[in-house]
């Protein structure tokens, strides 16, 4: 398991006083205000969210040490991480996306498909990205039907390839 987990990404500046748009990756967006110190990926900068309000599908937040629009603009695109021990424990069948990255992906017969490269959400649900050793990346819906088994301790996810892309249907060019 990873020692730190990405919980938010700083977006565009908001207003003139250093507020930023904050895209959170937590079930409860406001939870980032309770985690204490958030750091950049390299750990070089630390921030605390001192104030946040929900606007549409993001937060408008005030971060410690960011007081001008120019400072806020320079942070656009910065990912913010929190120490794993600050996060709540997961329930049975739940996990943090960070725990999936790097797991082996195998089909239901145990044949290797590749490695979990990322989990995406483009608005219509989670997508699991599998990077095979050779060939194109697989982007599959992260549903119980397609990913019936997530075995963090065993270091693998089991993929039930959807019929539309499993290669069993002939090309119709």
Swiss-Prot record:
GO molecular function: ribosome binding
Keyword field contains Cell membrane: no
Keywords from the UniProt entry: Chaperone, Cytoplasm, Ribosome biogenesis, rRNA processing
Domain of life of the organism encoding this protein: Bacteria
GO CC annotations on file: cytoplasm; ribosome
Domain PRC barrel: 92-165
Record localization: Cytoplasm
Matches recorded under InterPro entries: PRC_barrel-like_sf, PRC_RimM, RimM, RimM_N, RimM_N_sf, Transl_B-barrel_sf
Cysteine pairings via disulfide bonds: none
Pfam families: PRC_RimM, RimM
GO BP annotation list: ribosomal small subunit biogenesis; rRNA processing
Summary of subunit composition and partner proteins: Binds ribosomal protein uS19.
Protein's job: An accessory protein needed during the final step in the assembly of 30S ribosomal subunit, possibly for assembly of the head region. Essential for efficient processing of 16S rRNA. May be needed both before and after RbfA during the maturation of 16S rRNA. It has affinity for free ribosomal 30S subunits but not for 70S ribosomes.
Family per record: Belongs to the RimM family.
Comment block on domains: The PRC barrel domain binds ribosomal protein uS19.
HAMAP family given in the database record: Ribosome_mat_RimM
Name the record gives this protein: Ribosome maturation factor RimM
Lineage: Bacteria, Pseudomonadati, Pseudomonadota, Alphaproteobacteria, Hyphomicrobiales
Gene from which the chain derives: rimM
